[in-house]
Swiss-Prot record:
Glycosylated residues (UniProt): N47, N82, N105, N153, N176, N187
Transmembrane segments: 224-248
Gene: ICAM2
Extracellular face residues: 25-223
Family per similarity comment: Belongs to the immunoglobulin superfamily. ICAM family.
Species, as recorded: Homo sapiens (Human)
Residue intervals annotated with topology Cytoplasmic: 249-275
Disulfide partners: C48-C91, C52-C95, C134-C190
Gene3D superfamilies for the chain: Immunoglobulins (2.60.40.10)
Sequence ranges assigned to domain Ig-like C2-type in this UniProt record: 41-98, 127-197
Subunit composition and interactions: Interacts with RDX, EZR and MSN.
Record-linked Pfam families: ICAM_N
Subcellular localization, as worded in the UniProt entry: Membrane; Cell projection, Microvillus
Identification of the protein by name: Intercellular adhesion molecule 2
Length: 275
């Protein structure tokens, strides 16, 4: 092929790729909002629009309840209600026989309304371990939740969660720590953060009620030996004193009974036998 023919073919291919014919008009479809988070049974307004001046047909595709609130040639405004699960809304328009669409992602959430903190045990010796547990019932989506465990202003532990089934779940974070002397003067607490920014929502925070430990000093082995010895001596003295009192009492009783016995026998002795 000659160089002229090669250049002609290249120009023709470039024209076909970059410059489509007038029967293939380029247009765009937009949806607002592109993503949004709503609570169960919630509703939202969705706007579908297009750059096509005279679209042939357009609308919103969804399995949920929808109402057309208003419309013009290039846009339609809907109310979508009774949203009970994550879903995708699809706006579509047809222009010159060609259809374009755009999706809106809707997420259902339940914010953390209750955060329960548990310390186990609540009475701990210095140097001994204890468990901090934070529990958040009925929250979703779990993959947007983070639980923070605090000792005073110090973050002891935080926990995130993987994607779970699209339903309210219970989230739990557990951390084992060692008690020190200052823990008896510190508040322990838990913070639940549900971050829905990536889903078109807000950030929700919920704190637990603060709790405190009761801390005591453990008794050393030498102290324990001294305590046991002292208790043993005191117990021995007590038992000895009780026994001595008992023996002394019996002795006195026998002495009294002996005197009374002689006198009684003397009274019973007939007069003839008395001196």
């Amino acid at each position: 092929m000659s160089s002229f023919g090669y250049r002609t073919l290249t120009v023709a291919l470039f024209t076909l790729i970059c410059c489509p014919g007038s029967d293939e008009k380029v247009f765009e479809v937009h949806v607002r909002p592109k993503k949004l988070a709503v609570e169960p049974k919630g509703s939202l307004e969705v706007n579908c629009s297009t750059t096509c001046n005279q679209p042939e047909v357009g609308g919103l595709e969804t399995s949920l309840d929808k109402i057309l609130l208003d419309e013009q040639a290039q846009w339609k405004h809907y109310l979508v209600s009774n949203i009970s699960h994550d879903t995708v809304l699809q706006c579509h328009f047809t222009c010159s026989g060609k259809q374009e669409s755009m999706n809106s992602n809707v997420s259902v959430y339940q914010p953390p309304r209750q955060v329960i903190l548990t310390l186990q045990p609540t009475l701990v010796a210095v140097g001994k371990s204890f468990t901090i547990e934070c529990r958040v019932p009925t929250v979703e989506p779990l993959d947007s939740l983070t639980l923070f465990l605090f000792r005073g202003n110090e973050t002891l532990h935080y926990e995130t969660f993987g994607k779970a089934a699209p339903a309210p779940q219970e989230a739990t974070a557990t951390f084992n720590s060692t008690a020190d002397r200052e823990d008896g003067h510190r508040n322990f607490s838990c913070l639940a953060v549900l971050d829905l920014m990536s889903r078109g929502g807000n950030i929700f925070h919920k704190h637990s009620a603060p709790k405190m430990l009761e801390i005591y000093e453990p008794v050393s082995d030498s102290q324990m030996v001294i305590i046991v010895t002292v208790v043993s001596v005191l117990l021995s003295l007590f038992v000895t004193s009780v026994l001595l009192c008992f023996i002394f009492g019996q002795h006195l009783r026998q002495q009294r009974m002996g005197t009374y016995g002689v006198r009684a026998a003397w009274r019973r002795l007939p007069q003839a036998f008395r001196p």
